[in-house]
């Protein structure tokens, strides 16, 4: 049994309030200073392991607004995979890869005692730094850089001055053709054994974060500061995704120390495409992982602070996102990265029917003044559909763990160091691949599980393991050399589909009728081309794109790439040109990226362009 040291922090002196101060998170107008003093309380059965620097569990006691609080913390043991590595590049381009010891780290999750809705994400590396939610309000805590090293500042998130007044938005505009209307609760209770395979135990998104050269410049070549910033990001991302039963272990950190390895520009869509190609060609063959996010300090175009592909988790090129390091507050950047990973997991922007209990939700198209750490009801339902429809195998396998430190015991049904399997006692073992006496696989075993594994042996090469979902998707076949079905691939973008009504885009065939059907239901019919002339107006709902908050009217050749219009017909009601427009989510109801707008032409960023330009 893992032994735990409990640590209690009490106040050495009374806290006091300050009116204004400049902290790492920015200018803070109202803050509280506390002086924690560490007092250890050792239960008789708890003995700290001598090689361990940071405890597995801790408690911190301090006051907030005169109210005593007890903060319980537990080490986030899913923060790193066992094979975590870091790579940077020499001036002549050579890869320099190290495997730092990260098992005994200082990043924690927690909660406030007697507050069931509280949460916390804290770094205890040098004092306490992070955030916690208390009585429904978000607080930040950080050490003060004073001669008295015990001083900490505690302040409400709302008391941090805004860095600027501009809205900050995700650059994703494509919808997934699914309605955001509430799904009956009963449907959430229907779970087949196949679905249960994904929800219990946790899913794992093995993540590599790539830091570009602009970040190195921003942090003045301080790689330690970059590592700390990234670790805090991933710690918070894990706290966010736990509500979806997803763990996000960091398997690697790439730092482009001397120069960028792709052309990183402010055009988010271009950078995203180039990063996806680099990941597929160079990063994935070198390091197995499920998803990679590019973190950049470059100011992305317009109001965009992030962009990612939708429903592409586990795909070699498209399981990526681009995130701007847009704030001094780590939480805001973490929420942005969680949002983009959410897109990869099949989540689209929340609509008017979506809620997460009164907060601005993770998948809101606009980052709120107080960023939420919660997913909406729509996101939960979309994620479940993504799992059952796409079968993303890569997130099923757990990463190598770093937290099993007790001696292995064969027969306890726990996979521990030195064991290849553990199916329990020989009398109870039901695993034909495992020798229960030795906890080793039988010598003839080729595999244990996977879509290309049957009775502990690889399925024959050519056996279909993932059928094509539609004419834009490819069927995958077993190789005869692996238990895993090959990476999900689809036909090239621009391939004609649906009897030439559309062109393939990222494995789907986007056409206007399908988008209208998803937005308005079955009472829609084909729309008249004349309706799209409204998009030439450049008014509040009818336009092609936005630049610096200004709505740009469509040129005549681009009018089919702005607001979508649908022909709606029901008993006693006929609307020939019905737009879908919601002020809170103006991007929803725009014509999807990749939709056909003419022969050999598709919509791309609000313009009707030739296929060879778009793809």
UniProtKB/Swiss-Prot annotation:
GO BP, sorted A to Z: proteolysis
Residues in the signal sequence: 1-20
Disulfide partners: 314-394, 354-378, 356-361, 410-439, 421-434, 423-429, 433-456, 447-453, 452-478, 465-485, 472-504, 497-509, 516-566, 531-577, 544-554, 561-603, 597-608
Domain Peptidase M12B: residue ranges: 203-399
Cofactor note (record): Binds 1 zinc ion per subunit.
Required co-factors: Zn(2+)
A cellular component term, taken from the record's GO annotations: extracellular region
Matching InterPro entries: ADAM_Cys-rich, Disintegrin_CS, Disintegrin_dom, Disintegrin_dom_sf, MetalloPept_cat_dom_sf, Peptidase_M12B, Peptidase_M12B_N, Reprolysin_adamalysin
Glycosylation sites: 263, 269, 377, 523
Organism of origin: Daboia russelii (Russel's viper)
Residues that, per the record, bind Ca(2+) 1: 206, 290, 394, 397
Swiss-Prot/TrEMBL keywords: Calcium, Disulfide bond, Fibrinogenolytic toxin, Glycoprotein, Hemorrhagic toxin, Hemostasis impairing toxin, Hydrolase, Metal-binding, Metalloprotease, Protease, Secreted, Signal, Toxin, Zinc, Zymogen
Main location: secreted
Motif (D/ECD-tripeptide): 471-473
Quaternary state and interactors: Monomer.
Manganese as UniProt keyword: no
UniProt protein name: Zinc metalloproteinase-disintegrin-like daborhagin-K
Tissue expression notes: Expressed by the venom gland.
EC numbers, comma separated: 3.4.24.-
Annotated positions binding Ca(2+) 2: 412, 414, 416, 419, 422
Cellular compartments annotated: Secreted
Top-level taxon of the source organism: Eukaryota
Lineage of the organism: Eukaryota, Metazoa, Chordata, Craniata, Vertebrata
Function: Snake venom zinc metalloprotease that possesses high hemorrhagic activity (minimum hemorrhagic dose (MHD)=0.82 ug) when subcutaneously injected into mice. May also potently degrade alpha chain of fibrinogen (FGA).
Activity regulation, free text: Addition of Mg(2+) or Ca(2+) increases the casein hydrolysis rate.
Propiece span(s): 21-189
């Amino acid at each position: 049994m893992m032994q735990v040291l409990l640590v209690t922090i009490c106040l050495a002196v009374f806290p006091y309030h300050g009116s204004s101060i400049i902290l790492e998170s920015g200018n803070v107008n109202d803050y509280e200073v506390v002086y924690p003093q560490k007092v250890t309380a050792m239960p008789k059965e708890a003995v700290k392991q001598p090689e361990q620097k940071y405890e597995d569990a801790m408690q911190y006691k301090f006051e907030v607004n005169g109210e005593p609080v007890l903060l319980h913390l537990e080490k986030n043991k899913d923060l790193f995979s066992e094979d975590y590595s870091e790579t940077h590049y020499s001036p002549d381009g050579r890869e320099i890869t190290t495997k730092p010891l990260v098992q005994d780290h200082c990043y924690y999750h927690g909660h406030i005692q007697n507050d069931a809705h509280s949460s916390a994400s804290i770094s205890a590396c040098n004092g306490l730094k992070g955030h916690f939610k208390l009585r429904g309000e978000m607080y930040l805590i950080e050490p003060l850089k004073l001669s008295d090293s015990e001083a900490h500042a505690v302040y409400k998130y709302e008391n941090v001055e805004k860095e600027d007044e501009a809205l900050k938005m995700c650059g994703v505009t494509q919808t997934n053709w699914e309605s955001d209307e509430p799904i009956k609760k009963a449907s959430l209770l229907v779970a087949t054994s196949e679905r249960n395979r994904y929800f219990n135990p946790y899913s794992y998104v093995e993540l590599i974060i790539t830091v570009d050269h602009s970040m190195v410049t921003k942090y003045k070549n301080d790689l330690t500061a970059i590592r700390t910033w990234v670790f805090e990001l991933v710690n918070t991302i894990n706290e966010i995704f736990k509500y979806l039963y997803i763990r996000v272990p960091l398997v690697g950190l790439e730092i482009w120390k001397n120069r960028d390895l792709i052309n990183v520009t402010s055009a988010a869509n271009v950078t995203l495409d180039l990063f996806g190609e680099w990941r597929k060609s160079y990063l994935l063959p070198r390091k197995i992982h499920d998803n990679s996010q590019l973190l950049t300090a470059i100011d992305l175009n317009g109001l965009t602070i992030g962009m990612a592909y939708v429903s592409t988790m586990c795909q070699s090129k498209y399981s990526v996102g681009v995130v701007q390091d847009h704030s001094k507050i780590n939480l805001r950047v973490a929420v942005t990265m969680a949002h983009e990973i959410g897109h990869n997991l099949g989540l689209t922007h929340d609509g008017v029917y979506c809620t997460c209990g009164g907060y601005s939700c993770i998948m809101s198209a606009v980052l709120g003044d107080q960023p939420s750490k919660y997913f909406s009801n729509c996101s939960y339902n979309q994620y479940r559909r993504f799992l059952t429809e796409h079968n993303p195998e890569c997130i099923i396998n757990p990463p190598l763990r770093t937290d099993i430190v007790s001696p292995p015991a064969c027969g306890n049904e726990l996979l521990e160091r030195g064991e290849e399997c553990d199916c329990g006692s020989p009398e109870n073992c039901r695993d034909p691949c495992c020798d229960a006496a030795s906890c080793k696989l039988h010598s003839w075993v080729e595999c244990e599980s996977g879509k290309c594994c049957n009775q502990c042996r690889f399925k024959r090469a050519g056996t279909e393991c993932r059928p094509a979902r539609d004419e834009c998707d490819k069927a995958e076949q077993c190789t005869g050399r692996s238990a895993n079905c090959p990476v999900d691939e689809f036909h090239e973008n621009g391939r004609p589909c649906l009897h030439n009504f559309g062109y393939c885009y990222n494995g789907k065939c986007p056409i206007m009728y399908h988008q209208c059907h998803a937005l308005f239901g079955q009472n829609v019919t084909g729309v008249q081309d004349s309706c799209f002339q409204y998009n030439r107006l450049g008014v509040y709902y009818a336009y092609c794109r936005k630049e610096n908050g200004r709505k740009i009217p469509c040129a005549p050749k681009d009018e089919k790439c702005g607001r979508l219009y649908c022909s709606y017909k029901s008993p006693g009601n006929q609307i020939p040109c019905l737009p879908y427009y919601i002020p809170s989510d103006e991007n929803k109801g725009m014509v999807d990226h990749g939709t056909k707008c003419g022969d050999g032409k598709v919509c791309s960023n609000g313009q009707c362009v030739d296929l060879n330009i778009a793809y």
